[in-house]
Amino acid sequence: MQRIGVFVCHCGSNIAATVDVKKVVELAAKEPGVVHAEDYQYMCSEAGQAKIQEAIKEKNLTGVVVCSCSPRMHEATFRKAAERAGLNPYMVEIANIREHCSWIHKDMEEATKKAVILARAAIAKVNLNTPLQPGESRVTKRALIIGAVLPEFRQPWISQMQDMK
């Protein structure tokens, strides 16, 4: 079983105005493997990242779930913070409760229910994750085309493939 920390961001009022952040923390704390759960105004800030790093070290966390905004925006931020604290960065999962809950729901109860579901899904994923290691593979610049090619497209393909040699 993993030792998971769950961190729920208010994103100022972006999330907290529609999602009951305290309720998400309370229910996430009861999930299997969760040994730490807390909320903070801006998890992506230096202070927010420091909270994650402190919890990783103090609670010996093996996985982290951040309930915040889009992974596209801050997944790298949280993975780097976890890595600086000694945690494999691929043991960090993001539950996008801003775009998927607070921005699309007007009803706080519905938005909160959905945020809890997303948090639980991310926690379940971390419980099943294993640390990954980045690697490199050699790539051979070849292609095999199977099927008929229209005559007007044939010549450009052949010349491009000959250039690859």
Task: Enumerate the language-model features and the residues they cover.
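Residues forming the flavin
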Residues: M1-K165
